[in-house]
Each structure stands twice: as structure tokens, then as C-alpha cells.
Amino acid sequence: MTSLSVNDRKDFVDGQMKYWRQIAESDGFDIDDVPVPRGTRAGLWSVDCKHPRFRLRACLPKIYAMVGLHRYNLLRGTNFEHLELLKYNESMNCVCSYYITSVAVDLSSQLQKTFQIRVDEKSFGDLDLTVSVARPNDEEKVTTEKRFIHHFHCEAAADDFYKGALPDWPSVGDLNNQKRFYMVKKCELQSNDWIRLYLELAVGVRYQQTSESDLSKLQVLKVAIETKEEDVQPPNRRLKSKSLHVYITFKGLAKAPIGDEIGEHVERKAIVRRVIDERSGHLTLLGGFSNAKNDLNQSSDDEQPFGKRRRI
């Protein structure tokens, strides 16, 4: 292997510093005219979604854009819905950061806006990510006075109840405690479409090449919401909690993310934790799958009363 001369090494370092300085000027979003220096192995790939040959083969960029809008709506009380992807930049790693530019429409006014959304993955193949930027592109930008880090580097600050590994799937005794859990009614699923979004996200992250056609087969069967706050009134107000655990029973996935049962008819279980840090605005989502046998709508007097659950 030929080693670089002193001058070559200096040119390489200078080129990298200039490259990342230009990236930082737009927070990683508008880099169409920024050339990638030769030898770069940890830069950003740019994808033009409006190019005639562009085809969205994997669903993650679109789902990430939708999650970013979800974060914006939660914090601002708005009702923007994803319309189309314009472009996105993706870090050159297995565990990626995405800088997405997309168009969304406000369902209440039909106003369209262009959004910039940043999603940082923390692990590969499992749902563990943070949305740190979700803003209309005409709003004030993050300035370069703040150091630009192009990969995962922070997450939403969480209460102890929402830290650590995901909880076990709740037992029947757990679910009988209505001070802690809320069973979502079927009529509430449409107005809380973020529940399905979280399920699609968990599946899409586990199976990176999942298509929109694959996701359309998923059917949400039952949902339970858990929050730290006890005796919330009315009970369905838990759906608006900034931090929560959501337990989803579903079918429509032929593969087995956990266990060995194959087929779209098989009922499967997903758990997703949501934490929103209102101070920083960060949204962190952590998710996984369970092969617990108990059902969400079972009821029995033989189960142990609700208490602290073992965490995995």
C-alpha cells in the first residue's frame, strides 16, 4: 500500500474540513452543489427524489419524513400530513442519519409547506432513533455556531420510567390496572394514525427493503397505551401523552421478527416507546417485538395484581 506524502495528507485533511464546513452551513440539508472529496468514506449520499429515474424501493425515507411531521404536530398542535419527498441525504454508514426535504399539507387549511427533517439512527435493524430537526424550511435555521455532528449524538431526555430496555409485554394483571393502561378503541385508531405509523416504522427498520405494498398488508388488531401518570381522566387522554409505551397486536407480516411462526395470518406483537423532550424538541422512539402468549383483551382473576414489571 502506497502511503500518502505530507502534502497529500494535508490536501486530504483540508478537503475534508472544507467539505464538512459546507455541509454544516445548511445543517446537512442543501448540499446539492457540495462535491464529495476524493477518498471520503463517511460523508453524505444525496438522492434527488424528483429525478425522472428515481424510484422509492425502500420505504424508510418516506416513513422517516412522516415521523418528523408527527414530531412537529405533537409540539406545535398542527395537523400537517406528508405529501411528497423532494430529496434526502443519507450518511455513508450502516447506522445512518437522514436529512430529508419533503412537502407537507396542513389538512385544516390546505396550506403546503416544505419541511426539513433530520432522523438519526442509533442501531441497525432495530427501532432506536431520534428526530432532532423537523421544521418548515422558511423558519429560522440552526446556526453554525452550534457544532454540526453528522451522526447520532443525542436523544430526548427521559424520566426514569422511560429509560433502559423496553418493558415486557404486559400480563393480564397489568392490563387490569386501568390507572396505568388504556385499551384503545377501534374507532380511535383513525384519529390516532401515529399508532400505525409506529408499527410501520418498527417493521420497516427491522426489514430494510420493506416496500409500501408490504406495509399496506399490516392490520392493527388491538392497542394498549401505558403512561407513568396514574388515574388519567378521561382515560383516553393518555393518547396525547408526550411520553408513553404503546403495545400493538397486529397481523399481515409473513416474516417472523421474533419466534418462528411464518405467515400473514399470525398475530404478532410490537412495543414502541415514545419520549418527547419539550425543552430540546427531540423525539426518541425505541421499539421491538414480543413473542408473549397472553392477549391484550384477556381478563382473569388468577393473575397477580399490577406491580413493577421485569424489564428486558
From Swiss-Prot:
InterPro entries: MS5. NCBIfam families: A_thl_para_3677. Belongs to the UPF0725 (EMB2204) family. This is UPF0725 protein At3g19520.
